């Protein structure tokens, strides 16, 4: 069985560090949140062990935290992919109303980007993954938080 170890990019005054949430696929959303908060806090306090920044398989980075709408992250080898999350903003969007007519609505939006190793992941599969992320975020119940 393959491990899913998610790297979380943490910006520090002296550079960037990527602690790893090990076996993320075995954790609940709240478990991932706890692990992320713990690793980020210890990264900022310079209290990570070398093992906690190794063996990531996929990284999530957030250039949006600095106000950037999007970025094109580079894969940290030997990982297979990295996803960038841009700034979350309210934007006008064309929506289809209940009557079937187009209407303008204000929606919370963000751009996501995915860089991946084509030797490991087919482009169509990567695109399907991003579509899945989009659908999951758009339909995630607020009570699920």
Feature roles, as predicted:
Residues 1-145:
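C-terminal catalytic/motor cores of large multi-domain enzyme assemblies
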């Amino acid at each position: 069985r393959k491990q899913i170890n998610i790297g979380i990019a943490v910006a520090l005054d002296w550079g960037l560090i990527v602690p790893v949430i090990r076996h993320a696929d075995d954790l609940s959303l709240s478990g991932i949140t706890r692990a992320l908060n713990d690793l980020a806090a210890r990264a900022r306090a310079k209290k990570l062990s070398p093992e906690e920044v190794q063996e990531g398989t996929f990284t999530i980075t957030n250039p949006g935290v600095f106000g950037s709408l999007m970025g094109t992250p580079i894969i940290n080898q030997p990982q297979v992919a990295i996803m960038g999350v841009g700034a979350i903003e309210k934007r006008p969007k064309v929506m289809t109303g209940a009557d079937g007519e187009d209407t303008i609505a204000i929606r919370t939006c963000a751009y996501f980007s995915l860089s991946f190793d084509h030797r490991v992941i087919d482009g169509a599969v990567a695109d399907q993954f991003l579509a899945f992320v989009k659908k999951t975020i758009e339909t995630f119940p607020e009570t699920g938080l």
